[in-house]
Design a protein with these regions (language model features):
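Positively charged n-region of N-terminal signal peptides that target proteins for export
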Residues: 1-5
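Cell-envelope and extracellular/periplasmic
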Residues: 19-144
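Bacterial N-terminal signal peptides
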Residues: 6-15
Length: 144
């Protein structure tokens, strides 16, 4: 139920700031890897390879601060937030909750998809660490 409310709230949140064009929505669902546990400081390693420098430039400003992507919106279930949901324009910090801003696949996925479609996109992300695919992600039709 919480996921459904999150999705509806996200769509309402974004719909007021968009034109009448259809919105590209991507669902990101998974376990701990989808949560995203990478520290922001790991992004500097992208500068070590000429092939990944363009990606780093899409993620960070020239001064090393995180870019905020105006055409990429995200709504993410976040237990560290009082409301249980963190939403806004995509930037560093939508990874797993904790003391420091973290990143997950939402960052590069969102940047790549927005660049590919050339339109505003919405990411709806939900992930839980420590879950079993065998039990926690089984559809009700799979039986006991």
């Amino acid at each position: 139920m919480k996921v459904i409310l999150t999705i509806l709230a996200s769509l309402l949140f974004v719909s007021f700031s968009l034109s009448a064009k259809p919105l590209k929505v991507y669902l990101l669902v998974g376990q701990s890897n989808m949560q995203g546990h990478a520290a922001e400081r790991t992004l500097g390693h992208l500068a070590m390879d000429a092939k990944t420098v363009p990606l780093l430039k899409a993620i960070q400003n020239a001064d090393g601060s995180a870019k905020v992507h105006d055409q990429i919106w995200i709504s993410s279930i976040e237990v560290a937030e009082e409301s249980g949901v963190k939403e806004g324009k995509l930037t560093v910090g939508y990874g797993a909750g904790g003391r420091d801003p973290k990143i997950g696949p939402e960052l590069t996925f969102g940047i790549t998809m927005q660049k590919h479609v050339g339109e505003t996109v919405l990411l709806i992300k939900t992930a839980w660490g420590g879950k079993s695919l065998n039990t926690d992600f089984r559809p009700p039709s799979a039986g006991p």
